[in-house]
Each structure stands twice: as C-alpha cells, then as structure tokens.
C-alpha cells in the first residue's frame, strides 16, 4: 500500500526526470491531475506526503509560535481586503452616483471595475511570484493598493466618475498581486494534505464573508453619517492595507525557494490573455449602458474572442513555459472545477449587486442598514470555512464543492422571490445564511485541491487559478445580469422586474455549476472506490 500511495503522490505532483530541471512529460497518465488527486485522498498517508515534500519544507521558517500566528494573521487580512475592496462601493453606490452625477445604468461599473482588473491580472501576478519571488510580488501589490485607494478618495474633488472607475481598476490591480501570492506562500510553507495547511487555508477563506461585511458596513456607516465624507471609506481601506503591508514585511519568511527550476515569464501569452479578458469584460459591462446595437461594442467583442482563442492555441501548442501548465489545460477534471467556480461565483456576483439595488432602491434602506444586513455572512461564513478545515481529511473536497454550488443556487432562487414588504428576518436572513456556505465551502475546497495537486514551483499559480475564476466571473457575469435587466425593465420604469430578471440569470448560472460539480463529485467517488480496491488488492497480494 505504501508503494501504491507513493506512486499516486508522484503522479499528482508531476513526475520529473530530474528535479533540478524543467518538468518532463512522461505520459498522459502522469499528467492527469484530476484522476490522481482523487486517488491520493483515499490512499496517501500524511507521513508519506511529508517525506516526499521534504525538499520543499524548511523547518526554520518560524522560530517561535507567535511568528507563525502573525504570518497567518497577515494572510487572513489579505483575503479580508480583497473582499472588502469588492463590496465597499455597494452600500454607497447611490451616494457615489449623486456625487459624480452618474447615469443609473453606469452603477455596475462602480463594482465591476475592481474585480475586472483583479481577475484579469491575478493569473499573471501568481506566475510572476513563482518566478521573481512570492513575497516581492505581494509587497508590490500592497504598494499599488495603498496608493490607488487614496486616489479613489481623492477622485471626489475631480467630479469625474470615469476617474473614479479607473482608480478602482488600479486598486483591483494591486489586489491581484496580493492574494494569489499569499496562497502561494502558504502552499510552499505547509505540507500538502496536512491538517495544518487545511486549517490555515480555511482561516483565510473565513475572511471572505468578514471582508465583504466590513467593506459595505463601514462604507455605509460613513455614507449615512455624512454622505460628503464617503472618501474616508477608501482612506480607511488604504490605512488598513498599509498596516498589513508593514506586518507582512516582518511576518512573511524571506527564505521561500524562488524559481529553482529556472522558469521564464510567458510574456506573449500574458499579453494575449490579459487583453482578451479585459476587452471581453468591458463589452459585457458597457453594452447595457451603450446598447448592443452600437458598432464598437460588436467590434470589441469580436476582437476579444479572437485574442482569447489565439491565447488558448498559443498556450497549448507554442508556449515554452505556459501560464497554465499543460497538465491543467488538458485535464478535464481541473476544467470542471474551474467551470463550476466560474458559474457559481458568477451567480453570486449578480446576487451581490442586485441585492443592494433591491435594498437601496426598492426597500429604501439607508446605506448603513443595507450594509448591516450583510452581518449574517460574517457569522455563518466563519462557521462554513472552519467546517471545511476540520473535516477536509474525512470528506472529499468534491463534496464541499458540490454543496457550495447548491448553496449558490438555492440562495439565488430565494433572492429572486423575496417579497418587497417582507421583514429582513425571514426570507433574506435565510438567503444570507445559505449563501455563506456557497462562498466558504467553495473557496477553501478548491484552493486546497489546486494547492495540494500542483508542484511547489507552481504554488503562486495555484493560488491564482482560484482567484482568477472567482474575481473575473463576478465582474463578467454582472455585466450579463445588467444586460438582462436593461432588456426587461422597460427603460427603467419597472426596476423590480429588471432586478428579478438578472437574478433569474444567476439561477441559471448556479444550476450549471451544480450540474458540473455534481458530475465531478460522482466521478471522484467512482475513482476513489477504484483506488481503494486497488490498494486493498496490493495489500492482499503482499
């Protein structure tokens, strides 16, 4: 059984002819990460994982327990800032629109610009971290976040919503360099498959609902107290980022191995991918404002598709060091996981925006009360994330992934039928609790899958994969939701009808996520059963 387990682990990590050189592909079986990760969960012991990863583990990363705790704290705050940055405009979107004199249809850009850029650049930032140093890229990201968060507040005095939206985009660019490199550092420091690593990733995942809650709540508090002081929501965000920047300098080890396989950056693929992603996202978020009948919208859409098709072909056939390892690109199970995350979090992005539209414009809540209704995310999100950390050794990640998509679907359905005059403590309270499990089962489970089953030299990229899908899908699908809204709201005369229409699209996306993740879960169980049977047979023969 020990030999069988070691073989499975070698397959899941990527088998190399020489560990000091670039990985050499031996066979299609060696590169089928999706199959090996399932078998690993059933046949591999923790001790074997430690031994096989010893080359990558430095026992002197932390001399004292408090150093490790401080490191974990800085990682958690990084995730908090990511989600807070996404939601901090939601509770004050009407205040921002009034301040800049924005048109109603352009409100989606107040939220979408941040995840658009962060989602488009995260994959590149993770690869840059793998090549030039995870900690270096993390600190670069914080510098960008600090500067552009301050500029977001200063844009008030320009009176230009375009300037604000661009500043939000650069704020998202900074976050793109923070979170994937944080997860990459965790992947390098902690041994894959161990309880310690799982619980740390779960702690980081638990910060998503906390960040989402604090972002909209704090901004709502400032906006309700004095709408003219809304820039302080961004000044405070910048201060928090600066504090964590300083802590990260001292808390994050500087001895993490950097690019020992001498990879180079795939600049051609990076340019093709980023341009394609940004243009596609721009089209979907701008079309509801300008109209799909505009020639430039159609032209940009065609150009974006061409860039993305060329990017995929280049990465598969021509790139010497592709942004995505070919084992991931060609592995059906990895694609399944990413598609499930895309549709699930896309539906959540639609819910998030139209939830606040519903609260502010239909129920006429104040910015503070609208932000305060997110409080259930804080409580139940922590519970959900810790549930993953404490049970992941006994429950397949595919199970958590499936039920997280079910939570996204059920939450979207409940949001689409919430009565206007019903108290918050009925349907909406239940919706928030259920959606908490959508967020905080999917993020830790998928992060653990990718981190444990990719080689250590790809840990920055492993963190990038999950965050790219999460952030980009929230922005892109929001544009799709806005398109549906504008088509059914009778030129803004029936707001509720438009909001419901967007939520129905979210239900459709979440349903697709359920089907894809359900198929992956069933296949995982079948392969796990086969792996156990093979292991038992080996023991019997021995």
UniProtKB/Swiss-Prot annotation:
Query: Which residues does the entry place in the Extracellular compartment?
Result: 130-136, 194-198, 253-262, 317-333, 393-399, 451-505
Q: Where in the cell is it found?
A: Membrane
Disulfide bond residue pairs: none
Q: Fetch the InterPro entries from UniProt.
A: MFS, MFS_dom, MFS_trans_sf
The UniProt keywords, alphabetically, are: Glycoprotein, Membrane, Transmembrane, Transmembrane helix, Transport
Glycosylated residue positions: 471
Q: Name one GO molecular function term.
A: borate efflux transmembrane transporter activity
Give one GO biological process term.
Answer: borate transport
Domain of life (superkingdom): Eukaryota
Residues that span the membrane, as ranges = 109-129, 137-157, 173-193, 199-219, 232-252, 263-283, 296-316, 334-354, 372-392, 400-420, 430-450, 506-526
Q: How does it sit in the membrane?
A: Multi-pass membrane protein
**Entry GO CC:** cell periphery; membrane; plasma membrane; vacuole
One Pfam entry for this protein is MFS_1
Keyword presence, Transmembrane: yes
Topological region Cytoplasmic: 1-108, 158-172, 220-231, 284-295, 355-371, 421-429, 527-542
Family note: Belongs to the major facilitator superfamily.
* Function per UniProt: Putative component of the machinery responsible for pumping aminotriazole (and possibly other toxic compounds) out of the cell. Probable ATP-dependent export permease. Appears to confer resistance only to aminotriazole.
Comment on protein domains: Deletion of the C-terminal 34 residues abolishes ATR1 activity, while deletion of the C-terminal 23 residues have a minor effect.
The miscellaneous annotation reads:
Present with 1720 molecules/cell in log phase SD medium.
Q: What is this protein called?
A: Aminotriazole resistance protein
Naturally occurring in which organism (per UniProt): Saccharomyces cerevisiae (strain ATCC 204508 / S288c) (Baker's yeast)
